[in-house]
UniProtKB/Swiss-Prot annotation:
This is Serpentine receptor class gamma-20. One of its GO terms (molecular function) is transmembrane signaling receptor activity. It is found in: Membrane. GO terms for biological process: sensory perception of chemical stimulus. Belongs to the nematode receptor-like protein srg family. GO terms for cellular component: membrane. The keyword Membrane applies. The gene is srg-20. The chain crosses the membrane at residues 27-47, 69-89, 106-128, 157-177, 212-232, 254-274, 279-299. It comes from Caenorhabditis elegans.
């Protein structure tokens, strides 16, 4: 068998696609790379699990579950937990634990439900996270632009937004369902790929239906948020710098993924020289997002940090008092009456 996977021009869905694993001259380095990635992905999964548990554990009039921002974040966090866990247990394992390649790869030379589900759910989660960043950015923009009506607005649109987040990513995965998913050599390990059954509906092209609106809307929402903040007095504006950095970082990371998908859909044949860079961005941008988002949210939100780690603080009970005022509004989505109370407490 060849160390390169050669796909015949005409092959049936059930035909085996065998290959021989490449020799790894740096086995320990590959294993170390896996352990490093498994460590930070595991940390992300644990932190996101703790955030989701805290969001749904707390009850009361001003619980996290009444907060549209936290509900949106919890939906994305569930996807992040799944993505991190499956990458640690399968995706990164088969790439970097190179001694396993000769033993494991033959199980996937023929069609496998495991690789099909892995590949399908991976792209479902990518599409979900692209859309969720649009929703979260819109949520934060409305906090600044419509602070008084923001909470009522999201009471009306939260359910349709959540349904859309879970339904729309199916538009990316339908071609995978009818396509042949296979494994191919990746360095001295192997990874999962597919041969599209519908040629025009490749994955990068289908992702564009989310990525292009994402690029446009994220820019619009960010500029609108900046404009809204400039209308605030200096004291409140300075209190929002950390949140703007947080929002901007999430947006930039998601837009990098969108740019990479646009490249693979339209520009790969014209700019082959930057293909390695685009592959690097596609593979790593969400790793940064997985780790950054829970850590930044926990560090930024003092009350959430206390509830997660059961820390004692000066603030009694469950609430968001003594926070920077717009940070309270953007993170807690409190009612206008609670906003006035918080303004008095600051």
């Amino acid at each position: 068998m060849s160390t390169r996977l050669i796909i015949p021009a005409n092959f049936s869905y059930d035909d085996p696609l065998p290959f021989t694993c490449n020799q790894d001259s740096h086995v320990m380095l590959s294993i170390l790379e896996y352990l490093v990635q498994a460590t930070y992905l595991s940390v992300s999964a644990v932190l996101n699990s703790m955030i989701v548990y805290t969001i749904f554990r707390c009850k009361g009039k001003h619980s996290y579950r009444r907060n549209p921002f936290f509900v949106l974040y919890a939906a994305e966090a569930v996807m992040n937990v799944y993505s991190c866990v499956i990458e640690v247990l399968f995706g990164r394992l088969i790439i970097y634990m190179t001694p396993l390649c000769p033993a494991l790869s033959p199980f996937f030379f023929t069609p496998s439900i495991l690789t099909k589900l892995y590949f399908l759910l991976n792209h479902y989660c990518l599409a979900f996270k692209t859309l969720s960043q649009i929703a979260i950015s819109f949520n934060r923009m409305t906090c600044v632009i419509f602070p008084v009506h923001h909470f009522k607005l999201w009471q009306n649109i939260l359910a349709p937004v959540l349904v859309s987040l879970f339904v729309l990513p199916l538009g990316v995965t339908w071609n995978i369902l009818v396509s042949r998913v296979y494994v191919n050599p990746n360095g001295a390990g192997f990874s999962v790929n597919y041969r599209d059954a519908v040629a025009w509906a490749n994955i990068s092209f289908l992702h564009l239906f989310h990525c292009i609106p994402c690029l446009f809307l994220m820019i619009v929402f960010f500029l609108a948020s900046i404009f809204g903040l400039t209308m605030l007095e200096n004291r409140l504006r300075s209190a929002e710098r950390s949140l703007i950095i947080f929002t901007m970082t999430l947006g930039v990371e998601t837009m990098l993924f969108a740019i990479a998908q646009i490249y693979f859909a339209f520009l790969a044949g014209y700019l082959p020289g930057i293909r390695p860079l685009m592959l690097l961005i596609s593979f790593n941008v969400f790793d940064v997002l997985y780790v950054y988002s829970p850590i930044a949210l926990i560090l930024m939100n003092r009350q959430l940090r206390r509830d997660i780690f059961h820390l004692k603080g000066d603030d009694p009970g469950f609430g968001f008092t003594k926070f920077p005022v717009i940070l309270v509004e953007m993170i807690s989505d409190s009612s206008p009456h609670l906003l006035i109370i918080n303004l008095q407490l600051v």
